[in-house]
Design a protein with these regions (language model features):
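Conserved C-terminal helix/linker of AAA+ ATPases
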Residues: 236, 259-282
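A short, basic N-terminal segment
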Residues: 1-36, 41, 89, 356
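C-terminal helical "lid" of AAA+/P-loop NTPase domains
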Residues: 236-242, 248-262, 299-302, 326
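C-terminal leucine-rich, beta-strand-based interaction scaffolds used for sensing/assembly
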Residues: 2-3, 276-356
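P-loop NTPase nucleotide-binding core
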Residues: 32-35, 39-44, 48-145
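Conserved Walker B catalytic segment
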Residues: 118-185, 193
């Protein structure tokens, strides 16, 4: 019997949860010569949603995670590798030979792909410009390539003025749709919404929200009904109350609940035992994370774990409090809705359980 919940990887097909309105909006927008910017906290399902859109659009696609790009040359090599996956090497050899800096190609028999490498001390800007130009040159005007740049805010750390150079190239391209994904809201907003930014209003801006509770209730009910029986309604409510409809944590907790319903003999405290299992399972990870915070950050996290609002923590100076919250939010440990809250509900339980 297969677990009907999936998390930690791209969620697709039967595991994909709702997002029908967002999916249709993305597909309509990318049907024209337009670009898309999507911002949301980590693990809200941006990558899964875009993967679903690409699957349904059936267009050539290049998907790059910019967290893996440690330099402009590395980003160029990533673009090359993705291009080689799309186009047979014999068809693009001549095009590659016309680049200002021709890469050295190597074949990886393990995955059947070609990779590009460049000589040491190569001109990084030229190499990257060539790679970005290739995206346009090799794209079919009748079947435009969609280029997804995940965690795009990371690009700012690769080189001075890289945003200006990329914008100058991309704005001239007619055969590519760019999709920019990012989880650091303040940085992404600065890149695409500040008037002086090179990427100001470069595409449609979408803020991906949590999945509506009604939709998640239906999704969970359909998948828990067989195992939970008349307990289904109470379990669904408990799961969503705990996770706040966060896509990742909802699937994670529901998965453990389902496992316990199906495989455990004692079903008297299924929900409580599932939560305890998740907290215990991540105990070492949470401890390492906790030790990485300074004292002020720990005090704030303890307050949030006790459901205190930020403005109630008057034992900390206002500037100190909000500077620390801003850093925690930037790194994804805290998210801001109506109030600040700890992003991981099970980390919240871990903190509360040790705060006494």
């Amino acid at each position: 019997m297969e677990n009907p919940f999936k998390y930690g990887v791209l969620v697709e097909d039967a595991f994909f949860t709702d997002r029908k309105a967002e999916l249709e909006k993305i597909k309509r927008h990318l049907a024209g010569p337009n670009h898309l910017i999507m911002i949301s906290p980590r693990r809200y399902g941006k990558s899964s949603l875009i993967a679903k859109a690409l699957q349904e659009l059936k267009r050539p696609a290049v998907v790059l995670n910019l967290q893996m790009a440690v330099s402009e040359v590395k980003l160029a090599a990533m673009i090359h590798k993705a291009i080689y996956r799309l186009h047979p090497m014999q068809k693009i050899k001549d095009t590659l030979q016309r680049l200002r800096i021709v890469p050295t190609l190597s074949f990886n028999p393990a995955d059947g792909t070609f990779e590009a490498t460049f000589a040491p001390n190569v001109d990084e800007q030229t190499v990257l410009e060539d790679a970005v130009d290739l995206l346009e040159t090799l794209s079919d005007p009748e079947n435009r390539t969609i280029v997804v740049l995940d965690e795009f805010q990371e690009v700012l750390g690769l080189g001075n003025g890289i945003d200006k150079r990329l914008r100058a190239q991309m704005q001239l391209q007619k055969n590519v749709n760019y999709v920019f994904l990012g989880s650091q809201e303040s940085m992404m907003t600065a890149i695409f919404e500040q008037v002086k930014s090179p990427f100001y209003h470069f595409g449609l801006l979408m803020h991906l929200k949590k999945i509506p509770r009604d939709d998640f209730e239906l999704f969970l009910t359909e998948r828990l009904q067989t195992a939970a029986g008349d307990k289904t309604g109470d379990l669904v409510k408990a799961v969503l109350d705990k996770t706040g409809c966060h896509p990742y944590y909802t699937q994670q907790l529901a998965s453990i609940v389902w496992e316990r319903l199906v495989w455990m003999q004692d079903k008297s405290n299924v929900f409580e035992d599932a939560v305890a299992e998740l907290v215990e399972e991540h105990d070492l990870d949470y401890e390492r994370l906790w030790l990485s915070f300074n004292v002020t950050q720990r005090r704030i996290l303890q307050g949030l774990a006790q459901n205190r609002k930020a403005d109630e923590m008057t034992e900390l100076a206002t500037s100190t409090r909000y500077d620390s919250l801003a850093k925690l939010a930037k790194n994804g440990y805290v998210i801001r809705g109506r109030t600040f809250e700890i992003e991981d509900p099970f980390f919240k339980d871990w903190i509360a359980g040790r705060a006494g």
